[in-house]
């Protein structure tokens, strides 16, 4: 499932960004001590966690009543996270992140490829809209809330 791969790739670039911000010093202090870098890393963590949550939910309900809806939502959310997450990771790293020797560029190039495989976020958002319209007005909230997922699974 591409959404799971994307979520894992996002976690990797988040880890690389945090590690770099802790190690790199600028103006006599770690880059991670600057508030703007902290804010960027929090935004990256937010994109990562929402993609991971959507992918995890889709995995948990495979075979369930709303499987297709959850899979579409996971791919749409994970794909939508790629652009802002990659931009933030490269901003934190600066030019070093674009060099051939650095792992960041390998991860972000792979994320960009996965983003469009099996349909972009626009495609999956369209599918979600169609599923919601086809299900009717009384079915959308139960599908969205996935109340059928058992606690503790």
Model feature map: region roles:
Residues 1-153:
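Alpha-helical interface subdomain recognition
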